[in-house]
Amino acid sequence: RKEVADPTGFRRVSLTCEDILSEGDEFFVRCKNKPKEFRPHPIAISVPEKLSLIHTDVGVNLVGSGGGLRLIDWQCPAVGDICEDIYSFLSPAFQILGERPQLSGEQIKSFWDTLDRPDLARRYSKLRAAFAWRFAGYCAWRAEILDDTDICGRYRFALSAELKYMEDFV
């Protein structure tokens, strides 16, 4: 249903690989302990013809099931690429930070089979590493600035999972 919502008036998020990667760079530059992993190369990809109202934190904000499934907690809505919401659902770091298990390969395959949108699957495959780089940067930064050792540990675990998720696709 959110796909038919008019996104006019909401903040606009980055839409190109280079811009998304640059946002990750901005997080990593603040960190003392930078990962040894390499920055993905930007892939040329056109901006979607239709921009969407996106949630930006889907994974842990779905309640209900089937036709009653709802997105709650709309703290950071934006105008952007629907693939960003797909990313926040599939990302291992988002799941870890939400204190949920990472999705299995079988669950991810089931997601794509159920969605039945090969066009989005292709687009996502081009953007995934950039989204993962940006969120890995966020996790690295948060792991360094927070005081709670348990939460910092969760961010470090999320960082390592996200870098692996990025590498699996680069």
Where do the protein language model's features map onto the residues?
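Surface-exposed helix-capping loop/turn segments at secondary-structure junctions
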Residues: 2-11, 119-120, 145-146, 170
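ATP/Mg2+ or Mg2+-diphosphate-binding catalytic cores
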Residues: 22-32, 135-170
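Active-site acidic catalytic loop and adjacent metal/ATP-binding pocket
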Residues: 39-84
